[in-house]
Amino acid sequence: MMFVLDSLGMLSTSKEMEDIANDKQVRDMTKSQLIKGAFRVLTLKLGQAQVPMLVTNHTYDVIGSYMPTKEMGGGTGLKYAASTIIYLTKSKERDSKKEVVGNIIKCEAKKSRLTVEGSKIATRLFFDERGLDKYYGLLELGEQYGVFQRVGNRIRIGESSVYPSAILASPDKYFTEEVMEKLEEAAKKEFSYGG
């Protein structure tokens, strides 16, 4: 079992609903306190029941900071209650005809008890039946940790050298069980505490 809340920023308080019904144009100053209190209780109860909760939320640009930064909406309740906070950004993935076929989703661990904070990874999501590309980024990770060797503009696999596009065109042929085990170890070194 898992609880999913989509989205925290779209929740309304009873005060906000009353204000809308009475045509009052006032700001709801109780929302962040209610969210903080709710997550204080939920974190304890869900932890005891060993039930994970996944929450989506929006971010906004912090005005006036020296460096441009993003912050979550809804106050600090979720920020302190969460075990993991991952910020997602996306860019369009285009094919050779310049048509949009999916998104490149970049993930940054802002807070984590499971992986190194600040670590970043990208994945690809196609809009068709291919869906989430489970091999995206593995060539680069494999090169970094010696699973693959780059020879010029090709990748050496065993005795042969292959273009990266050929590997990605038929990934099941090249990402064998043995290669995937090595990549799993590389991912642990890259993203786990204590490497």
Regions found by a protein language model. Name each.
Residues 1-37, 41, 168:
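Conserved inter-motif catalytic segment of the P-loop NTP-binding fold
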Residues 28-145:
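Phosphate-binding/switch region of NTP-binding enzymes
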